[in-house]
Amino acid sequence: MSHTIPSASVLPAVARRGFFTAAAAAVAAAKVVAAEDEYGPHAGPVRYPDYRLVELDKRFGKLKLGNTPIQRLYHSPNMLWAEGPAWNGSGRYLVWSDIPNNIQHRWLEEDGHVSVIRNPANNSNGNTFDTHGRQISFEHLTRSVARYEHDGTRTVLADKFNGKSLNAPNDGVVHPVTGDIWFSDPGYGALMDYEGTLADTGSVQPFQKEALYRWEASTGKLFQVADDINKPNGVCFSPDYKKLYAADTGASHYPDAPEEHPRLGHR
């Protein structure tokens, strides 16, 4: 949805004064926000509670600590697109992808050191860890779900469904009991060369209809869970692991969605 804002020249005198007053206030507020968003040795003091921590559902209020700030762990002008952060609780480190640069980084909790752990990284997007501590990456370039063993070797878990290539796996989670991997395949990484390789099919659905999948750990088989979501992107489990939530980043609307949240519905 877009809105056209009239220029000040076509507003009545009173409205123009209000327009410029509001604009000046917005600029001043933006400067305050920008100042508070600064990091590094010249940044101002942190204010509590951190205004950037916002709960859209009041039930999350009891989980928010008022004196907890957002901290920047790493910044580099060479990093183009940080995606797919995954925390390894045993190793106490964080990994993430820089999709266009085709690399993966690792941040160590012990000393804050950041290094490149995988180059190239097959334009990986999401990452997670299985119940054995092995890294799972969802790769655009190879259109596959890959597992990195403890010795560093790469094992392809899934790259086809019904004999056709996957589009470009995006994000996924591992069920802690079954070890199954649930992941999304919206196809973004096959629509351009910037974050993968452009598919030669000439379709916005490069090889498959956009879908959610489940890779079964006990058999190695791949099952399609749902294909009625426009662009399934980020996924996560409910706290009891009985529900899977998927973010739809496509321009879609559901007729059965509740009125207060028109973009949401029971899936």
Predicted features and spans:
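Asp-box/WD-like beta-propeller blade repeats and closely related beta-sheet repeat scaffolds
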Residues: R143-T201
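Short, conserved, GDST-rich strand-edge loop motifs in beta-rich repeat architectures
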Residues: S184-P206, T249-L264
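Blade-edge beta-strand/turn elements of extracellular beta-propeller
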Residues: L63-H75, H113-P120, D151-G163, A211-K231
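N-terminal twin-arginine translocation
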Residues: P12-G18, A26-E38
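Beta-strand-rich domains and repeat architectures in extracellular enzymes and scaffolds
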Residues: Y51-E55, P69-I99
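N-terminal secretory signal peptides
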Residues: M1-V14, A22-A25
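Beta-rich, blade/repeat-based domains predominating
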Residues: S76-R92, P120-E139, S144, N162-I181, ...
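Blade/loop signatures of beta-propeller domains
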Residues: D37-T68
